[in-house]
């Protein structure tokens, strides 16, 4: 007969966590598969991957800026203005529209700037250091206008003192004797300075007292005519005036004489062989020396009088 097994007699199944009574050992844990995480294990958080960065390019070596073209004329102008304390104007943009005495000026061309600026520099360098700064310090700044011509070559240059606090000298390229003209016009600026510095005296009486008896300037008598007193090679001893134009006014007389005082040498013998002209030159030189702080016995205009 089949024997009936009682449910109580069946061997009891053990769990992995129960200890084997026979050996006292715990059963080995059953391996788990990687795709089956334990239900009690914490979930691993998702961490985004860092995208790959491009390799940085090496820093380029800094290059110096490209050199700018040098404006030679403007550099020369700045040098003149800084050294001699005057203003210089040239070119259409700076001189067009300036029409003193109702005249018209024709502007320099760009290729003429440097040449005329160099001539002006060579003229100004003969004056004492700081000489033109005295004009500015006394409220009479001086400006040079460099132009091609004035009124269809009617003038080689002129002095404009419409406003005493803004003296102007216009010089033209067409003048072949630029240094003589420039020094003539500078004399007018000097006399304007002396008019103020010597006030209430004036610089002309002492000078004109040396003229011959009976002489009159054209400004005093439009019919005046004294050619016998004008310097000529065969009239040196009796010369009182350097040129015929010097007989126009006392100011023109002084300017015509001073321009020869500023020459390199006494080419025509005005000061060695003409005693009356020499005497007038000595008065003019002394007045300048006494009223300009920068002037003195070593000033260029004294050379021919020693």
Can you name each region flagged by the protein language model?
Residues 2-66:
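Ser/Thr/Gly/Pro-rich low-complexity, disordered linker/stalk segments of secreted
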Residues 70, 110-117, 121, 252, ...:
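Generic detection of long, well-ordered alpha-helical segments
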Residues 88-161:
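Auxiliary, metal-adjacent structural segments of Zn-dependent hydrolase domains
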Residues 12, 42, 62-113, 218-235, ...:
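Non-catalytic architectural context of zinc metalloproteases
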Residues 136-306:
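Active-site-flanking segments in enzyme catalytic domains
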